[in-house]
């Protein structure tokens, strides 16, 4: 039977504004989302039998129906209605529950891979409509462009071209629940949203919009997030911020050498996860 292996990239948020709480319990957001080439690896193989299995072997990531990638594959197999199944194995290189979108990226990659293997011929827009039912960030990874995301994250517009950047990602390993962060976020009436630059020709242009409303919740509870931001800036990052609901912090650098040097100094003896990646 047919098979393929795909890469599922992580993301960082250059901007995360929380606009309002919605009646359905979600929040309206304004985000600028950027993919980076720290990737999970996903192998998908179709089978003649109808069983579906997803294997990851990573602590904190369920196998089977509890995995968002399983749900994505199930949705596509149900659409195909051909009696086939699939085996999916995931090598997790993206930290789990880290603000980097790893689970959403895995689901999006499975949707795109199954679309290809099953020869369903769905457009990206059709895949995105399936993806948003799985998770608010899933459509972004199908969109495959640096995006301004609004609504709960499903309304996507391509951003102007941005310079390629090197990104240092550091995760201190503290557990931050996304639900807890949003529950404890104090929404104040805000004025008009800051206008985004029309052009992004330099690293400084990107750094000028770095902002994350969720830091107001996470940093008081986990001061190490602020410590990492300060350390990154001290070691040459042109900007540093928490990604998503954390706890991963990213720093932006002009070149790989600067990012690698900062990584070596920052995490020596800490036991923290750290990786240098490039924007996609």
UniProtKB/Swiss-Prot annotation:
Enzyme category, top tier: transferase
Protein species of origin: Pelobacter propionicus (strain DSM 2379 / NBRC 103807 / OttBd1)
One BP annotation, GO: terpenoid biosynthetic process
Listed HAMAP family: IspE
Membrane-spanning residues: none
Name of the protein this chain belongs to: 4-diphosphocytidyl-2-C-methyl-D-erythritol kinase
Pathway terms, separated by semicolons: Isoprenoid biosynthesis; isopentenyl diphosphate biosynthesis via DXP pathway; isopentenyl diphosphate from 1-deoxy-D-xylulose 5-phosphate: step 3/6
Family: Belongs to the GHMP kinase family. IspE subfamily.
Keywords, comma-separated and alphabetical: ATP-binding, Isoprene biosynthesis, Kinase, Nucleotide-binding, Transferase
InterPro entries, alphabetized: GHMP_kinase_C_dom, GHMP_kinase_C_sf, GHMP_kinase_N_dom, IspE, Ribosomal_Su5_D2-typ_SF, Ribsml_uS5_D2-typ_fold_subgr
Gene name of this polypeptide: ispE
Binding site for ATP: 95-105
Source lineage: Bacteria, Pseudomonadati, Thermodesulfobacteriota, Desulfuromonadia, Desulfuromonadales
EC number(s) reported in the record: 2.7.1.148
């Amino acid at each position: 039977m047919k098979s393929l292996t795909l890469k599922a990239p992580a993301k960082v948020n250059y901007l995360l504004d929380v606009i309002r709480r919605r009646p359905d319990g979600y929040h309206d957001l304004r985000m600028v989302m950027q993919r980076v080439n720290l990737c999970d690896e996903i192998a998908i193989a179709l089978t003649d039998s109808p069983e579906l299995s997803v294997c990851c072997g990573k602590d904190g990531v369920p196998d089977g129906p509890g995995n968002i990638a399983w749900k994505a594959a199930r949705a596509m197999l149900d659409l195909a209605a051909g009696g086939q199944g699939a085996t999916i194995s995931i090598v997790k290189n993206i930290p789990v529950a880290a603000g980097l979108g790893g689970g959403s990226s895995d689901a999006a990659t499975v949707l795109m891979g199954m679309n290809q293997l099953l020869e369903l011929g769905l457009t990206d827009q059709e895949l995105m409509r399936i993806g948003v039912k799985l998770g608010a960030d899933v459509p972004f990874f199908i969109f495959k462009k640096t995006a301004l995301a609004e609504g709960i994250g499903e309304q996507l517009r391509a951003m102007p071209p941005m310079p390629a950047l090197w990104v240092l990602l550091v995760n201190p390993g503290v557990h931050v629940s996304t639900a807890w962060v949003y529950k404890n976020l104090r929404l104040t009436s805000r004025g008009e949203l800051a206008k985004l630059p029309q052009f992004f020709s330099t690293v400084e242009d990107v750094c000028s919009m770095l902002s994350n409303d969720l830091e107001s919740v996470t940093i008081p509870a986990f001061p190490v997030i602020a410590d990492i931001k300060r350390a990154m800036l001290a070691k040459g990052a042109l900007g540093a911020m928490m990604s998503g609901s954390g706890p991963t912090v990213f720093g932006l650098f002009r070149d790989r050498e600067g990012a690698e040097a900062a990584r070596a100094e920052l995490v020596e003896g800490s036991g923290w996860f750290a990786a240098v990646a490039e924007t996609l």
